[in-house]
Amino acid sequence: SAQGQDFMRF
């Protein structure tokens, strides 16, 4: 959510 890496939360 910070820079568009919401998919990297895992």
Swiss-Prot record:
Expression tissues: Expressed in the CNS and thoracic perisympathetic organs (tPSO) but not in the ring gland, midgut or abdominal perisympathetic organs (aPSO) (at protein level).
Protein name (Swiss-Prot/TrEMBL): FMRFamide-like neuropeptide SAQGQDFMRF-amide
GO term, biological process aspect, one: neuropeptide signaling pathway
Function: FMRFamides and FMRFamide-like peptides are neuropeptides.
Main location (coarse class): secreted
Residues the record lists as Phenylalanine amide modifications: F10
Domain of life: Eukaryota
Family: Belongs to the FARP (FMRFamide related peptide) family.
Gene Ontology CC terms: extracellular region
Keywords: Amidation, Neuropeptide, Secreted
Compartment(s) where it occurs, according to its Swiss-Prot or TrEMBL record: Secreted
Segments traversing the membrane: none
